[in-house]
């Protein structure tokens, strides 16, 4: 059986697409007072170090989050996603890429639940 190590792919174009959509979905859920439940059945690491040997092998993040990191003005939907990525990266440098749990966590209200497997 082949093993999958997300550290090689963290922050690539697919992660950006998936996590941008996740931000939009969670924001839509927050429009109502009703609580929401987030279940991640394939939760990996909470964050991925982009300077690691794994991430450096193919440097897939360069065609994903790195292209967006230093953009100036962006649409609100993209700005929300980038704000969440910035929470994981205090300072100006892009060093870490958040996994889905860290993408969702800043949006959670007291009544919402998150379960990671």
What do these predicted regions represent?
Residues 32-40:
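Gly/serine-rich nucleotide phosphate-binding loop at the start of the catalytic core
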Residues 1-33, 49-63:
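Class I SAM-dependent methyltransferase Rossmann-like catalytic core
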